[in-house]
UniProtKB/Swiss-Prot annotation:
Binding annotation for NAD(+): 44-46, 79-82, 110-112, 115, 135-136, 157, 175-178, 186
Protein's UniProt name: Pentafunctional AROM polypeptide
Known pathway: Metabolic intermediate biosynthesis; chorismate biosynthesis; chorismate from D-erythrose 4-phosphate and phosphoenolpyruvate: step 2/7; Metabolic intermediate biosynthesis; chorismate biosynthesis; chorismate from D-erythrose 4-phosphate and phosphoenolpyruvate: step 3/7; Metabolic intermediate biosynthesis; chorismate biosynthesis; chorismate from D-erythrose 4-phosphate and phosphoenolpyruvate: step 4/7; Metabolic intermediate biosynthesis; chorismate biosynthesis; chorismate from D-erythrose 4-phosphate and phosphoenolpyruvate: step 5/7
Principal location: cytoplasm
GN (gene name): ARO1
Ranges for region Shikimate dehydrogenase: 1297-1578
GO biological process, alphabetically ordered: amino acid biosynthetic process; aromatic amino acid family biosynthetic process; chorismate biosynthetic process
Region (3-dehydroquinate synthase) residue spans: 1-393
Cofactor(s) listed: Zn(2+)
Region (EPSP synthase): 406-863
Length: 1578
């Protein structure tokens, strides 16, 4: 196949040549027209892998004339190398090769190469000739045309460059064959852009060919080819360009023509050329945030939609044109919103804050100073004016946000008179599409509503092959080519209908007419979450009774539906309950002519709802050739004959009468005039009566002809309430009437009563309830009636209340949003200069029926609008609750209490809530009386109510074991998890559970074996939960406390209450390669000494079952005190043991990791994209390490492989990059360090394996993989212990030896030296800790604070206060406690004073079973000395509500209390009698009195009374004695023996405060157990 070679002129020269397979033409033209001694082909290493590149180079070499030479230069790929440094490297190469001014440079590549090499050519030898050979679609149509060249700088893209026109641009379509699919689609954005601004005909051609294009590109394949340049087989994408060659050639050529024309008219971008930036002002702002995950064209696509919406908002571009643009971008596979699910996943759910977008937009070359300029469209193919226009931040904010601020309508002039034409009726549009699709012949439908609903309907009609659709009149007319229903067939994919209720009901019956297509023997209708709650049951029941097989795939009575195509629509007598929705009636009516027999449709259950809509359907069927007759003998019965619709040549949709109520009501409330020119008394729609039946009685002047309606409102504040109005003929309009009624008051009454609207409870939301709820925010009282609403209007407009910043909920309901947009503007509208505003949420939902409503309200009716980010008030109030599920006896009740205490949440036990509501006994009693099935139904109801009420309010909901038994409960659990809630599966070993349950008589008995119950439920627990915690069996109190501690850390990390930051200093993790950790638990603590994390090599485990792996994670956490886990499944090709291609098992293991909330997942960058993105989008608070290993020593550190993988890691936005090479020579370590120094955008772990590579491990900065002497072998060649790394680092000068001292007097018995020196020795640190005894601070200043090798000071009495004056800064703890026990050098003779005594107290308590948050409990402190101050601070930090203090004398305590703020809630206990009034649980105590003196009897009496108040604590009450000799003090003995308190010796406090010092000084993680043992041994 071939196409003709086209030549396009730029600046008077035919220099752009476009064709297919034009290598010979490229070489011939270059050698003929650009004679030179030296030709240099410059490309990136990705292009040099393509065989077509080698064909070009080979042909060039063969064709060179004598005396000429060809040089080639490869650069590293990617935007990161479009830099001044790369440019300099290229120039140095050219100079070294002796290139002179006659050199011709040929740039072969995408936009990065074209831009950069063009800039090289413009400056080398003050300018040499350049030829562009673009290889990507984006480069072909954009960057290669026009002579703009540049490189990036750290401050921005393309900031340094020049205009330098190429001699030729050779555009060879053949290059696109190997362009990756996403890059291909990325380039299409620029093609569509040029058609939008200049070429309407080409836009229409692009529309017509979209399906073919996307089909070809999406079916591209990966092929293996040999690359001579790389001497290896490489994988490339192959797209069958020849199958759409004419279309591709044309789209490239036409796009180039537009840009060439514009460039020729305005080469230096002074005016016309900036039209080429349509979509780029906003698109570039998105790109700046979303790069590198999002591509340029993807962001420009979103930018085009936003800038088109801005044009519509300014009343310049029609809604139809915007709809066409949105449709074509989506049709070519481009994103149209940052909120599209696939695009959000691709960009890893990055946020695009409004203020950041505006800031990015302010840095744009089109701007006029601080004024932002945007290209405005007039219509498809034509811009508004000849350059970009200045737009306000206010308008930009509106377009960019989904929340609207409506300012008071105090700017609307009296006497304003407007003509507003609402879009086509949704009801008529949807019916017309169904009738035309079922009809025979071509029908041109005019004024069709372009909305989400009709978009879904059009797509569905085409998917069902019911008709072909085309467009005329710039998209204003839809042309339906109907086939009389004969071609309806089942599609291979589900019909997605969003929240389009009308479409779902009409299409249910249409789908029943479809025939089987090959293997496709059913049609699935589905929609969004709200659509899957809306009712469709009566229609389905009716169709089922007529012989059709229809299944619900989720909840009964709602979508999704599965409609079998092998059963037929029989017809005959059909009965239908029509008291809920008239759309059920219309659905059967419209499809009835295609039943096997004539249909008699009887509506049962009472008077049908919305009769006027049924009449509308019948009248429209008549217009399409089928006459329905109403029975004269049976009520609400219709006879429909068999037949085919005959499509009228043209059908015009009248405007939507429901939508017309909004501008007409605007006139009513503002005292102005509005005319709707195409809705009058002859309308098919019941809502056309709104002005006459509602607004006129309210006091408006109404003029209505057969085809138009005009409303003039009375002076503001003079509308009258309606005593009663039946809105059954126009139910959708009740919302508009309600907001108008909110400001109605005739002086004697203010109550409006609306009835006949019961069906509004099952629309997009329960609209009656929504209206009552939201009106209340304006201070308007309303109440529900059985089939209506009563509104009690305010006495005057000035009484309308300003809603809070949380805003007005719209419930994703277009009519709620539009109605409240009117009332919002009336708030403060009586105050002339008031700038307040009312926030309306989810404004985009108006796209369902009137996408341009806000534009009309703003640009035509004159309202002032602004946009806003979602309110922080609202998001800060949301505390996602935790639902705990699991088998009976898994420990849910206990763990739920732990959970609530750890998070500061409230606890609701759902079984207890059931018993409270039941009121007649226990669950066991109810089951005995009513059976399990009834209990399960009630359980579901109570759970759903609890989630609705408490789901965002910080609750722990503890469920019964069988909550997963009912499908409805499972769906509710899944929905809660999908909405961001935590559904935690608490799991225990099933064997232990069985033993326990068999011995517990208090629970209702299972009617089957416990193991069978578990096997049935197991999969449900897994599928309903988004997190899992395995609670190991505890055989003693210590294990139980440890489990609580581990769980507390786990749940706080899940909720983000405890963050695990990526280390910013030297750190390590130890690698475990055991088959089963349970055999090595006693050694794990010591193995992990000094490490910030521990790697679980899952590929080495003996089993990959999810249960086994979950247990291993649990064991590891318990044994290492919740040390962060690196979860690694290393594949064989990356040096591990896991099979390379077992992706299903790998995905299941990664899912286990995510559900167990491991702190890190090592994700190999060679894995398929779908696995990578799946993990990245579900990672929650888990950090991702993107890793790549080169075991074969195939890639030196300057190879493009590492660069490509680094760019890949950046695009995936992993948290840490981990690269492991293999050192062959010592120089490989130096090459690695050079790579490390230039790759600093992400934390980087970079090491070399083998003995030769050990230096790289020593020099690595963060999370270096290490081994331990206690492990049988290292996990990788050359791996070192942490101590070895530190010793080597010291020896090469990286870790200078420091001196540390404890200062004060007396310190002869101080354990600090042994504490710290033990840690230094174990971790291989070169430091030494000694005693320095003195009482004189001046000696300390002179002899210690001046030492250059000083690492830190531990300060004890009497210097804790004296040292403060020598400190440059103090920590918050030191300031509050008023003492310093830790001195940290800051450099330059400056020091920071800190206090770790409080951490010694806090961590001693927490490590002995006290929750990290004890909210609801009180604390107790005995003593008034210096340690008491630290104790006060510590107890406040763990959340004690009140702190009680005891001492022999209270004077010191009163002074101490006065030195702390009231928020500490310190209560000095003066007498024993005072303790009687204390009602709180006293659960935590710290003794700060000497242990070598007997306690005062009165103090002892008060102490005993307070210790007695710990008996009902939710955790075991715990006392710490700060004295560490003797090991059990008298107070400890009293608390333990008499009051059953848990006791903690002072030695633990000593060690805990000491290891905190150790960590602050060295940055290393101290080996706690070894230090503790060393300190406490006598």
């Amino acid at each position: 196949m071939s196409v003709e070679l086209a030549k396009v002129s730029i600046l008077g020269k035919e220099c752009v040549h476009v064709g297919y397979q034009i290598h010979e033409h490229i070489v011939k033209s270059t050698l003929e027209h650009c004679k030179s001694s030296t030709y240099v082909i410059i490309n990136d290493t990705n292009v040099s892998k393509v065989p077509y590149y080698h064909d070009l180079v080979s042909l060039f070499e063969k064709s060179l004339p004598e005396g000429s030479r060809l040089l080639r230069y490869d650069v590293k790929p990617g935007e990161a190398h479009k830099s001044r440094e790369t440019k300099a490297d290229i120039e140095d190469y050219l100079l070294l090769e002796g290139c002179t001014r006659d050199t011709v440079i040929i740039a072969v590549g995408g936009g990065v190469i074209g831009d950069m090499i063009g800039f090289v050519a413009s400056t080398f030898m003050r300018g040499v000739r350049v030829i562009q050979v673009p290889t990507s679609l984006l480069a072909m149509v954009d960057s290669s045309i026009g002579g703009k060249t540049a490189v990036d700088t750290p401050l921005g893209k393309n900031f340094v460059g020049a205009f330098w026109q190429p001699q030729f641009v050779f555009v060879d379509i053949k290059w696109l064959e190997t362009l990756p699919q996403r890059e291909f689609i990325n380039g299409i954005a620029e093609v569509i852009k040029t058609a939008c601004i200049w070429n309407g005909e080409e836009f229409a051609r692009l529309e017509a060919n979209a399906e073919t294009f996307l089909s070809v590109v999406n079916n591209s394949q990966t092929v293996s080819v040999f690359s001579p340049h790389h001497n290896e087989t490489v994988e490339l994408t192959y797209t069958n360009i020849e199958s759409m060659l004419e279309h591709t050639y044309k789209l490239v050529l036409e796009s180039i023509k537009v840009k060439a024309h514009v460039v020729s008219s305005d080469e230096r971008e002074s005016g016309l050329r900036n039209l080429l930036n349509f979509g780029h002002t906003i698109g570039h702002a998105y790109e700046a945030i979303l790069t590198p995950q999002a591509l340029h064209g993807e962001c420009v696509s979103i930018g085009m939609v936003k800038e088109a919406e801005l044009s519509r908002y300014m009343n310049i571009l029609s809604a139809t044109q915007v709809a066409r643009m949105v449709k074509i971008l989506a049709a070519y596979g481009l994103p149209i919103s940052v909120n599209e699910k696939w695009f959000k996943e691709l960009t890893l759910n990055k946020k695009t804050p409004l203020d950041v977008l505006l800031k990015k937009m302010s840095i744009d070359k089109k701007n006029d100073g601080s004024k932002k300029k945007v290209v405005i469209l007039e219509k498809i193919g034509k811009c508004y004016g000849t350059s970009a226009h200045v737009v306000s931040d206010e308008d930009l904010r509106f377009v960019l946000s989904d929340e609207t601020l409506v300012h008071p309508f105090n700017n609307i002039p009296e006497g304003q008179n407007k003509v507003i034409t609402p879009p086509g009726s949704k009801s008529i549009s949807n019916r017309a599409l169904i009738l035309a699709a079922l009809g025979k012949g071509t029908c041109k439908i005019k004024n069709l509503l372009h909305s989400d609903d009709t978009k879904h309907m059009l797509n569905a009609v085409q998917q069902l092959k019911g008709a072909t659709i085309s467009w005329e009149d710039d998209g204003e007319t839809v042309v339906v080519h109907g086939q009389g229903g004969s071609t309806l067939t089942a599609p291979s994919e589900a019909l997605y209908l969003g929240n389009a209720g009308t479409a779902s009901r009409f299409l249910t019956t249409v789908a029943a007419l479809a025939k089987k297509d090959g293997k496709n023997d059913h049609v699935i209708l589905t929609g969004n979450a709200r659509m899957q709650e809306r009712p469709i049951g009566p229609l389905v029941d009716s169709l089922r009774s007529n012989g059709l097989k229809i299944d619900y795939l989720n909840r009964q009575g709602s979508l999704p539906l599965k409609i079998n195509t092998e059963t037929n629509f029989k017809g005959g007598k059909i009965e239908l309950a029509a008291t809920v929705s008239s759309q059920y009636v219309s659905s059967i009516l419209m499809c009835a002519p295609y039943a096997e027999e004539p249909v008699t449709l009887s509506l049962i259950g009472g008077k049908p709802i919305s009769q006027l809509y049924v009449d509308m359907t019948i009248k429209m069927m008549d217009a399409f050739g089928i006459k329905v007759t109403t029975s004269t003998t049976e009520p609400f019965t219709y006879h429909i004959p068999k037949g085919n619709y005959i499509n009228p040549a043209e059908y015009t949709i009248e405007s939507d009468a429901s939508s017309a109520t909004y501008p007409l009501s605007f006139a009513a409330i503002t005292g102005t005039t509005v005319t709707v020119p195409n809705i009058g008394s002859a309308s098919l729609q019941g809502d056309a009566r709104f002005a006459v039946d509602v607004l006129r009685p309210m006091g408006c002047e109404v003029t209505q002809t057969a085809t138009s309606t005009t409303v003039t409102g009375p002076p503001r504040g003079q509308l009258k309430p309606l005593k009663h109005v039946d809105m059954e003929p126009m139910t959708d309009a009740f919302l508009t009437a309600s907001v108008v009624a909110a400001i109605c008051n005739n002086g004697t009454t203010n109550t409006t009563t609306i009835e006949g609207i019961a069906n509004q409870r099952v629309k997009e939301c329960n609209r009656i309830e929504a209206m009552v709820t939201q009106l209340a925010k304006f201070g308007v009282r309303a109440n529900e009636l059985p089939d209506g609403i009563q509104i009690h209007g305010v006495n005057s407009i000035s009484e309308l209340r300003q809603p809070s910043d949380a805003g007005i909920e719209t419930y994703d309901d277009h009519r709620v949003a539009m109605s409240f947009s009117l009332l919002a503007g009336m708030v403060n509208s009586d105050k002339k200069d008031d700038e307040s505003s009312v926030r309306i949420l989810e404004r985009q939902c108006t796209g369902k029926t009137w996408p341009g409503w806000w534009d009309v309200l703003h640009s035509q009716l004159g309202a002032r609008l602004d946009g806003a980010e979602p309110s922080t008030t609202k998001s800060s109030e949301v505390k996602k609750s935790v639902v705990i599920i699991g088998m009976r006896a898994a420990g849910k009740s206990t763990v739920s209490k732990w959970c609530a205490e750890s998070l500061g949440y409230r606890l609701l036990d759902l079984d207890e809530e059931f018993e409270r509501q039941y009121g007649k006994g226990t669950v066991k009693d109810f089951v005995a009386e009513s059976g399990w099935d009834e209990f399960r139904k009630e359980e579901t109801r109570i759970f759903q109510e609890a989630v609705d009420k408490y789901g965002d309010k910080g609750y722990v909901l503890s469920s019964g074991g069988g909550i997963v038994e009912r499908s409805e409960s499972r769906q509710a659990l899944k929905r809660f998890a999908e909405s961001g809630g935590i559904v935690l599966h608490l799991h225990r070993d099933i064997e232990e559970t069985i033993v326990f349950l068999k011995s517990d008589p208090t629970r209702p008995a299972y009617i089957e074996e416990i193991r069978d119950v578990w096997e049935r439920r197991e999969k449900w627990y897994h599928e309903c939960s988004n997190f899992t915690f395995f609670a190991a069996h505890c055989s003693n109190e210590i294990e139980f406390r440890n489990l609580r501690h581990v769980f507390s850390n786990f749940i706080r990390r899940v909720l983000g209450a405890e963050k695990i930051p990526v280390p910013s200093r030297r750190s390590a993790f130890v690698c475990l390669t055991f088959e089963d950790l349970s055999d090595h638990l006693s050694k794990l603590d010591e193995i992990t000494y000094g490490c910030e994390a521990v790697e679980l090599r899952v590929d080495h485990l003996s089993s990959f079952s999810s249960d086994f792996v979950t247990k291993q994670i649990s064991l590891l956490r318990a044994a290492t005190k919740s040390l962060p886990i690196v979860f690694t499944v290393r594949t064989v090709s990356q040096g591990g043991k896991f099979q390379d291609d077992d992706y299903d098992l790998l995905e299941s293991l990664l899912k286990v990791a995510l559900k167990n909330a491991v702190e890190y997942i090592d994700l190999e960058l060679t894995l398929p994209n779908n696995i990578l993105y799946n993990v990245l989008n579900k990672k929650s608070n888990t950090k991702i390490i993107g890793s790549h290993h080169d075991f074969a020593a195939k890639f030196p550190w300057d190879d493009a492989e590492w660069e490509n993988r680094y760019n890949q890691a950046l695009s995936l936005d992993v948290d840490i990059v981990k690269f492991v090479g293999t050192a062959v020579s010592f120089d490989d370590n130096l090459a690695l360090e050079k790579f490390r120094s230039t790759h600093t955008l992400k934390p980087l772990i970079a090491i070399n394996m083998t003995e030769t590579g050990k230096l790289s491990r020593v020099l690595n900065n963060i999370l270096t993989p290490v081994t331990s002497k206690l492990l049988p072998s290292a996990a990788a060649p050359g791996q070192l212990t942490l101590a070895e790394i530190n010793q080597l680092y010291h020896q090469i000068g990286g870790l200078p030896a420091k001196k540390f001292f404890v200062i004060g007097s007396p310190i002869g018995h101080s354990r600090s030296p042994i504490l710290h020196n033990t840690g230094y020795e174990l971790l291989g640190l070169p430091h030494h800790f000694d005693k320095f005894e003195t009482e004189d601070i001046e000696v300390v200043k002179k002899e210690l604070l001046t030492r250059e090798d000083l690492g830190g000071l531990a300060v004890t009495i009497p210097l804790k206060l004296d040292i403060i004056d020598s400190m440059f800064e103090l920590s918050e703890a030191a300031k509050t406690i008023g003492a310093v026990n830790t001195v940290i050098p800051l450099g330059k003779n400056k020091f920071r004073g800190d206090n770790t005594d409080w951490l010694g107290i806090k961590n001693s308590l927490v490590s002995n079973g006290v929750p990290s948050s004890v909210s609801g409990s009180a604390g107790l402190i005995i003593g008034a000395g210096g340690t008491s101050r630290a104790a006060i601070y510590a107890l406040k930090q763990i959340g004690c509500d009140t702190i009680y203090m005891l001492n022999r004398t209270t004077e010191k305590l009163q002074k101490l209390k006065s030195e702390f703020s009231e928020e500490y809630k310190i209560v000095v206990v003066e007498s024993a009698e005072q303790t009687e009034s204390i009602k709180e649980q006293v659960s935590v105590a710290v003794s700060c009195v000497p242990a070598d003196k007997p306690l005062d009897p009165e103090l002892l009496n008060k102490l005993e009374r307070l210790l007695a108040k710990g008996t009902n604590s939710s955790f075991k009450p715990t006392l710490l004695d700060a004295a560490y000799k003797p090991s059990v003090t008298p107070i400890m003995k009293l608390a333990r023996d008499k009051f059953n308190w848990n006791i903690v010796p002072g030695a633990e406090m000593l060690v805990h405060q000491g290891v905190e010092q150790f960590s602050k000084w060295t940055g290393a993680k101290p080996p706690f157990k070894a230090i503790f043992d060393a300190v406490t041994q006598e």
